[in-house]
Amino acid sequence: MQIYNSLSRRKELFTPAVPGKVNMYVCGITAYDLCHIGHARSAVVFDVLVRYLRHTGLDVTFARNFTDVDDKIIKRANEEGLTSQQVAEKYIDTFYEDMDRLNVLRADIEPKATGHILEMIALCEKLIAKGKAYATPSGDVYFRVRSFPEYGKLSGRDIDDMRSGARVAPGEEKEDPLDFALWKAAKPGEPSWTSPWGEGRPGWHIECSAMSEKHMPLPLDIHGGGQDLIFPHHENEIAQTEAALDKPFVRYWMHNGFVQVDAEKMSKSLGNFKTIRDILEGYLPEVLRFFLLTKHYRSPIDFTFDSMDEAEKSLKRIYEALSLARTERSRSKWSATPLPADVTAEFDTLDRAFDEALEDDLNTAAALGHVFGTIRLVNRLLEDKNLRKSAETLALLERLDGLVAKWMKVLGVFGREPEAFLSDLKECRIRRKGIDTTKVDALLEERKSVRAAKDFARADAIRDELAALGIEVRDTPSGAVWDVL
């Protein structure tokens, strides 16, 4: 598999340090608020990576942490009249609920920062002993950035350029404006722990270094997160870990792109902040997961409700094809009509292309393109009145079951019973569009009556009236059926 390594800025062949085993760490949430769709993207991207690596036979140990002590958590605790621990527990619970709905697998190891205070203190002590960090009279501990010559190697930033714009805030006791906090002296009303420098709490960056070192052998095979974490968080992780341990921290760095809303970066200040729960009020969870896979993970993805509608339509087409394929397979008699020679070859090619897309830096967008290619091929067979009855078509439909199982295993979508998904989707669209089903049923009943009376002008007028309500009517041998446009 080729992976784009943010450290080398190029694609590299992925080879685990220990053949057959992968140690992977992804930065998790700071538990102070509901998860937004940026969190959803990171979670889904690395969930697919874990799924795919396991699909290829690798033994993956996956860790994702929780930051449960932080300035934002303390601020939220004061706002809500809760303790920091209560706030963190509340939003860790909502994180799990959201991830379960998005079919994101639980990590094997889910460490919390507050459970690793001793490890963080020990790492600080090691850095101080090496002259890479220093304690201030007030009890803060800072990392000496200039003591690590390779600082900036991940983000590509020049240390002198950073220095020119850096300032020491009033009250700080930094030796250099670039230095960052490893340990923060306690403030009144904040959670704190006893340390060699007095009461205090860890800085954000030291947390992931201490937790990953405790739970996994270093260097990690893969460390992931959003592109916003490259600097300063991941840059600082590298500096403090490698300075303390004198060995590489991570072999492959992977970063997913931003989620934009209407072509602007999502932020609370712009008023375009979308939580997962906001979106799932109007769309099925599988639609959101599918949408997040429609772009390459390193590219930005633009969230709009139009793009969600398009993702919903695409997913609906796939499930409709799977439903039709299942219906056709129930046929009792099959003909000996041969399929064109290239059909089976095309089926095989699309299957291989799906895997090749994921081998190429986890290109889920291309992989989904090959899923659609497979569905188009199946639809082409089922639309041909002769080929749909062929025993060779039956053999391909039976193989389709295996492909769908693989798609589900790797991408985490297409795994529901088609009829159940389509029924839930219809109900979801009815709610989202505020459709009055009582009125729809009454119009359909009237249309049935006027058609029986051969008043086709009125029947067509009712069809148009239903279309204006967002309803599509199809006449079948067993009667009219309707769906939401």
From Swiss-Prot:
Its main location: cytoplasm. It is found in: Cytoplasm. It comes from the Bacteria. Pfam families: CysS_C, DALR_2, tRNA-synt_1e. A motif ('KMSKS' region) lies at residues 265-269. It is an enzyme of class 6 (ligase). One of its GO terms (biological process) is cysteinyl-tRNA aminoacylation. Monomer. This is Cysteine--tRNA ligase. It comes from Nitratidesulfovibrio vulgaris (strain ATCC 29579 / DSM 644 / CCUG 34227 / NCIMB 8303 / VKM B-1760 / Hildenborough).
